[in-house]
């Protein structure tokens, strides 16, 4: 191992780099603990200590020397070092613009460098780093190999399918032989008794062939249906386990389009393509028999096979590009459709139906055009296969007739050979014609792989602690949503005592909601710690945490179920008494009781059957029903009418009793009775105190906001 890699001994950039890289790989790390264990002399992590610390976190490392031309092919992020010994993390490379996104640990900011600028700081040495979970994820990558364990799991059924296929091929081999006997023996010698025997035998063979063919289809469909169920269940579980950042970085329609690719895989598994592969594997037996009849005619058949393969190889890349384009256009349509249906109130209110229709027509035309190009190319591919097949048939007819005339082959043998060649060519032709399906399912697996190969929230090795009490601490929090995004929170320090009611106010974009997202462990801060009862949330099980936090947002989603089911969503077996108690606490019981079906009333999709105030009160009841020790109101009343807000505020004292409550609001009247009010501006806490105390500072932001709202 090289030893000349410089690590700055005065400023501990090594620890900071380790924390960032570990968090990127969803590995929880406590910086203070790492420093305590490995920074024994207090001078910062040197190279050996850094490697030992990374190993203790089960991170896999590899020190390499790379030329700048090879960098686009390595797995990022990676740690590189500069001439002055200060660490730099290479985050991303844009090969089109030849620019490099780095994270400067000294300035704690991302930078975009040109190739020349990056070349000045890059000496060729770097540390590639990944986690064991990432390695296991790569080994379990979803692609065609995913189906191998499934085949092994159902190997008994597939063995039965192969056995049935063997018998079917034997029957397919016997039938042409019967025809040869009829042509060369029965017709020549006028053997009616032999004809009767052959007819009965052929009838028996046909019956068995039909029964076995149906049995094979049933067995195969049964096994593929099981695989389909496993894949569908795995897909949905994995989708819900993905971190919230996955969904925030993708359009809803794009995700829906990827999930719908499961239909393509389902059609492929239950179709005739795989049985055609089995039939093709048994073609070697037919080739042996055909060679026995006529080596010359068999050579013609064999020479046609490379033509099928070459034609498929020629068509495949063009077809794949057009299928990719078709998928992209379909994803655009899905996204626009979801967006339009979700925003139908706005579309109608603004009377922009013509504009939206115009956009849809253009996108639909693009999709139809892409689909048409796929269809045309697929048709060309199929006709090319037909051309090869017909050409081989003509050559065999001409050559076979010459062999019969010369006495090298009988008429019965020629007919038998053509029937056998049909058994060989048929699965080849079917596979060639189904090549579009192979291409489509390959693209579908790639699209699904974007979902199934994305890392889920890491629960393994996380702490499931006892019931929380509600002490909260944010220590030196620094956070941004993406490495190249602006800083949202910068060196935020905040302590909240158990049972304290905190109000957080500030301008839009000041970082108020981001604080609560960190508290729910939707994200891990770039720097600093979020603590509950002294426990670092980076080390905690997210499910354990979220079960003990109640959250009410400005736009809460209700499922298309009964009111009771929505309130008791986390525990369907919950007693009715608990549901009613939570509803009373949220001020929802009275209006629920006035409904014809009461708590059994179906709320409609997204709660469309209720008013905004009613939906909000049900959402509050849902947040309270588990008696959470921490309660978050994130603009929970900003969109309500004054009557609905008044009902909720009347019950606020009961709601907050015995809990730690964080209220984020733009209306200062919502938080003026809080124990403490936090004022945020551009990712910093600029003021804090009680309502009256903050009003005393006429130069403060809180006073300014209060004056605006008062006026």
Curated annotation (Swiss-Prot):
Residues passing through the membrane, by range: 162-182, 195-215, 273-293, 299-319, 392-412
UniProt-listed SUPFAM superfamilies: ABC transporter transmembrane region (SSF90123), P-loop containing nucleoside triphosphate hydrolases (SSF52540)
Limits of the ABC transporter domain: 472-707
Domain Peptidase C39: from-to ranges: 1-129
Effect listed in the UniProt record for changing residue 91 to T: In serotype 8
Primary location: membrane
Active-site residues, Swiss-Prot/TrEMBL: 87
GO MF: ABC-type transporter activity; ATP binding; ATP hydrolysis activity; ATPase-coupled lipid transmembrane transporter activity; peptidase activity
One of the GO biological process terms: proteolysis
Comment field (misc): The sequence shown is that of serotype 2.
Family affiliation: Belongs to the ABC transporter superfamily. Protein-1 exporter (TC 3.A.1.109) family.
Cross-referenced NCBIfam families: type_I_sec_HlyB
Role, per record: Involved in the transport of the toxin RTX-III.
Name of this chain's protein: Toxin RTX-III translocation ATP-binding protein
Gene coding for it: apxIIIB
